[in-house]
Amino acid sequence: MTFSLNTKIIYPENGNDIKNAIILLHGYGGDGNDISALSLNWKRFLPNTIFLCPNGHEPCSINPVGFQWFDLSNDDSQYILEESIKAEKKLKLYINEIKKKYSLENSNICLSGFSQGCMMCINVGLTSDTDFNCVVGFSGKIINKENLSNKITSRTKMFLTHGDRDTVVSSIHLLEAKEFLLRNNVEVEIKMINNSDHHIPIEASSSALNYIKKNLII
């Protein structure tokens, strides 16, 4: 089966059965290969997990060798919202393909992403038919709180982490996301990483792994 998004796949080692999937979504201008680096540290602790790292559905407007989930070259909030909704639809189709291919349910799937990928994970995690196992997000935010609050259909629990010195996506968005999620009865844990800019430091990766291990049936 060919997926609708070009995907880097990391299979369980030693031919282990696939019981879980972690879908890793890259940031603006990145690609699936970039974000797949997380699997190098995680896979030995998650022996029955397949990692799927798709490229965004369109080339990045400012970095044509990379990809994006939605265009940021126009800073109009309504335009960004409309583009992100298009990406949501494509991701939901892609996730359904994964579920069919590997005989998985949402409860077997962790959504994880960095920056723009984190934003998409939050939206998909709250607008699906049933809860995913969890969302693990790095350095992201909620794209449009008013729009999202009006279409919540699921309440996937979340772990969100952010660098306190992030100069790309301000760390204030972590606190805003926590407040929004709690107000909408979504279980959330957060971790602010000291002296960290817009990347995924080892502390964030390790904390995220520990959270995933608590939630996935290994």
Feature annotation, model-predicted:
Residues S36-S39, S170-F180:
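Short alpha-helix in the alpha/beta-hydrolase fold that links the catalytic acid
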Residues G113-G117, C121:
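Gly/Ala-rich beta-loop-alpha elbow adjacent to hydrolase catalytic centers
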Residues F159-H162, D166:
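Short beta-strand/loop motif that positions the catalytic acidic residue
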Residues F159, L175-I218:
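C-terminal catalytic histidine-bearing segment of alpha/beta-hydrolase fold enzymes
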Residues H26-Y28, S112-F114, G163:
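Conserved alpha/beta-hydrolase "nucleophile elbow" surrounding the catalytic nucleophile
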Residues N6-L104:
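Serine-hydrolase catalytic machinery in alpha/beta-hydrolase-like enzymes
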Residues T130-I142:
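A conserved short beta-strand
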Residues S103-G113:
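Alpha/beta-hydrolase fold nucleophile elbow
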